[in-house]
């Protein structure tokens, strides 16, 4: 049995152990090799390289903590800048006197491109040959990849240094076949050799269906068409390892049409939702009974992110397979893939164009999703189709309470924003400073000045500090009957909201019109 390295190994300690072995009349080279093999490494150079890397990591953690502790607030803000998600930190605070060991490690992981510390820790403890494989994969260096694999074919699959308790399931970026697709998507490998890189790994023994089918899931999620082809050519299961359609769900949701077509050509199963996304109207119609009801199995295949859900022990279905839910998803896939003939048919069968589409990660309507995807000619056609068939610009998503116009704006889809803004609801006209359009809308329907959104917010609640026409907006709303002391569903007044989101000038103007700042809540 191999000896285990300590959690924080020291090269100096290893060199002392080499000296101990040399006392038995062993040559320096033999002593180093003996020690390396005791710890499960093929050579002294690999053991030394691993330990030096771990020592440098510990030094880096210590340097970061010391610099943070003695730095001013601007230094601390700079040090915290690489953070991916502040919510993952114990204490993300540039005014804090120190940063914890845990937060320092997470910050370093984020700086290296890893969302979580355990993912970066896993990478650091990979077998050195596996790390060399991943390094070659990431830049598309086929010659170097073949060289490493020829010396150690087992490096085509993830393995870790002895004594390291690898997380389960294996982090995706510790899997060489996953890294092929990620490198294509991130633009690290621009050599166009994704197929050849994948084939070299498979020829060396890489498992095409490892970790529940992660390699093909990665290829379809990252839009790596040639990688997907290589995997399928070598036996990757086109419907996923459990035959539940997980790969197609990713391709559909992420709008990788070429990959969806590839999966279908290679025999992937289609339910009514996937057939709708592929424009297979004949197949779509085959799922309806004579009286228009959906047949059993119409929504039999997975929702997006099925692999992640299975890894957590959950079902691949995010939502109940009711007729309304199945129709909503089918309409969603048809629209984001520009299959408007299919969409027309689904609407005739009762699909709700303004439903919050179930079973997805976005908790929004189809119009929200299309507005965020960006404007190319097919998107414009879909937008016009949706609006002509009654899609609402005032429905708000459940996570961020944004409208489709807001989604276009925050996703920087300015062409779509410009197309939609003049048709937007009154709340968005206030939010986006459209004073001229606001006047016209209120002249036509003054009652809108007092209208409320789903959270009870009036147009006045949408005032904020970046408006150039704030006073004019307030005045025109008041002139058409807006209540300067209106409260939202949580009991918050207009003035409370503007006091938080607006400017002192806006607050004073509202006060001059009779607004009062009272305690939140209703009696």
What are these regions (language model features)?
Residues 127-135, 158-186, 209-220, 241-252, ...:
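Ankyrin-repeat boundary/"N-cap" motif
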Residues 1-146, 151:
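Intrinsically disordered, low-complexity eukaryotic regions enriched in glycine, serine
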Residues 149-155, 196-207, 229-237, 262-268, ...:
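Ankyrin repeat domain, specifically the short helix-to-loop turn at the C-terminus of the second helix
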Residues 155, 162, 183, 187, ...:
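Alpha-solenoid repeat scaffolds
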Residues 144, 193-197, 226-227, 258-259, ...:
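Conserved ankyrin/ankyrin-like repeat signature
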Residues 47-48, 113-124, 252-266, 405-421:
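Short, structured interface segments
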Residues 58, 66, 124-197, 280-282, ...:
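Extended repeat-based scaffolds of very large eukaryotic assembly and lipid-transport proteins
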Residues 140, 193, 223, 255, ...:
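Ankyrin-repeat intra-repeat helix-capping/turn positions
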């Amino acid at each position: 049995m191999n000896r285990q390295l300590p959690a924080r190994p020291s090269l100096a300690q290893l060199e002392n152990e080499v000296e101990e072995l040399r006392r038995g009349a062993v040559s320096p080279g033999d002593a180093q090799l003996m020690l390396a093999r005791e710890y499960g490494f093929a050579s002294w150079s690999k053991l030394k390289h691993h330990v030096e890397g771990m020592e440098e990591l510990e030094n880096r953690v210590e340097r970061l903590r010391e610099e943070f502790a003695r730095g001013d607030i601007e230094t601390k803000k700079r040090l915290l800048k690489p953070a991916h998600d502040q919510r993952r930190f114990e204490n993300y605070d540039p005014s804090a006197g120190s940063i914890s060991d845990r937060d320092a490690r997470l910050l370093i992981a984020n700086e290296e491109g890893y969302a979580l510390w355990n993912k970066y820790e896993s990478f650091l403890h990979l077998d050195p040959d596996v790390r060399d494989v991943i390094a070659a994969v990431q830049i598309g260096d086929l010659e170097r990849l073949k060289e490493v694999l020829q010396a150690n074919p087992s490096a085509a699959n993830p393995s870790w240094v002895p004594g390291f308790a690898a997380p389960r399931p294996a982090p995706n970026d510790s899997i060489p076949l996953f890294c092929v697709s990620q490198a294509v998507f991130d633009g690290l490998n621009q050599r166009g050799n994704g197929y050849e890189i994948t084939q070299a790994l498979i020829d060396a023994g890489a498992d095409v269906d490892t970790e529940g089918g992660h390699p093909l899931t990665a290829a379809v999620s990252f839009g790596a068409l040639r990688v997907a082809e290589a995997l399928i050519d070598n036996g990757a299961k086109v419907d996923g390892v459990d035959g539940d359609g997980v790969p197609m769900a990713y391709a559909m949701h992420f709008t990788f049409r070429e990959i969806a077509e590839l999966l279908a050509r290679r025999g992937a199963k289609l339910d009514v939702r996937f057939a709708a996304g592929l424009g297979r109207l004949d197949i779509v119609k085959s799922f309806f009974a004579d009286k228009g009801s959906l047949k059993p199995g119409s929504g039999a295949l997975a929702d997006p992110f099925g692999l992640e859900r299975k890894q957590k022990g959950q079902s691949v279905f995010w939502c109940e397979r009711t007729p309304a839910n199945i129709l909503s998803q089918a309409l969603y896939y048809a629209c984001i893939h520009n299959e408007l003939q299919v969409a027309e048919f689904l609407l005739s069968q009762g699909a709700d164009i303004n439903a919050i589409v179930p079973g997805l990660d976005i908790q929004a309507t189809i119009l929200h999703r299309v507005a965020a995807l960006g404007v190319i000619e097919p998107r414009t056609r879909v937008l016009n189709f949706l609006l002509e068939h009654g899609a609402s610009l005032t429905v708000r998503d459940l996570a961020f309470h944004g409208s489709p116009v807001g989604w276009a704006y925050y996703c920087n889809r300015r062409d779509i924003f410009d197309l939609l803004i003049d048709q937007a609801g009154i709340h968005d006209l206030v939010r986006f400073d459209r004073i001229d359009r606001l006047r016209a809308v209120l002249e036509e329907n003054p009652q809108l000045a007092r209208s409320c959104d789903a959270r009870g917010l009036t147009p006045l609640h949408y005032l904020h500090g970046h408006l150039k026409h704030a006073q004019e907006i307030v005045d025109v709303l008041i002139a058409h009957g807006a209540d300067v002391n209106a409260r939202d569903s949580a009991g918050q007044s207009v003035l409370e909201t503007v006091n938080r989101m607006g400017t002192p000038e806006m607050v004073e103007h509202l006060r001059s019109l009779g607004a009062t700042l009272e305690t939140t809540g209703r009696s």
